[in-house]
């Protein structure tokens, strides 16, 4: 085993338990008080050093407890490591680095046979090949995560660009469609009818973000007409902005807004007593339908469709046995046919005498 920064068996700096951080803000404190420690890949390791294990021969229980968090490759006790009286120190190597991380986080400062465990990483027990393997795995993980992030960002920009292109292509014919009637506006998912054209005044007036109005060259025209033209231009510009915003919202959220039908609106604002009466009426209708269906099935009605195969007659090759079997069949038919059937009015009375219990509203 290779050591990097200290003699094996001696207490190293990263093996010492740090004090609890007292300067942490209240909103950052967890359930248990902890110290502030940042672990990089060179400080993490498959090897975990467990200190504070009571010297009662509980190595089997300790290994079983740590095996809950991952596969353990090897474990052994460190007799030469300095420890407190009546305690032992164990070294456990996990097969995966993530298992070692979880085991350290879960088992650190946990009670075990009356003692408090202290779990820390022990990268000094790694060989050169194990360290290289750990660094290669970390590099592969970083490359994979950055690649996924770049792919996600590229896809996000591409989707935004495609949405802009689709939006511009759909809004390119928007002014022409606004000249049509409300039937044309229903294709654009507009909530109102815009039968009037966007600019129903002089073609010299342009209603856009860079608003410009050319005064007519005729000096005899008064200022009132010019003010009316400006007012119309402002009105059309605001109307066009409202239509563009409505179209953008409808394209951004397709299918999310659904108009309520008149029946749904009426059901929503129906009083509670009326709703209960309506439910009671529906239950009674269901009971009547079930009774009618039972009566129809019980009546001898000719059914159109493929007939089921009849019961095959068993031939016992003995006349006496065949006679006995036929007598038994006839007797069974008489017994079945002699069962009285309740009339239909009694069936309805039974259903009415036992009404369905309504569910109480809490």
UniProtKB/Swiss-Prot annotation:
CDD domains: RRM_RBM48 (cd12442). Component of the minor spliceosome. Within this complex, interacts with ARMC7 and PRPF8/PRP8. Residues 353-362 have a biased composition (Basic residues). The gene is RBM48. It comes from Bos taurus (Bovine). Residues 46-124 form the RRM domain. As a component of the minor spliceosome, involved in the splicing of U12-type introns in pre-mRNAs. One of its GO terms (molecular function) is RNA binding. GO terms for biological process: mRNA processing; RNA splicing. Belongs to the RBM48 family. This is RNA-binding protein 48. One of its GO terms (cellular component) is nucleoplasm.
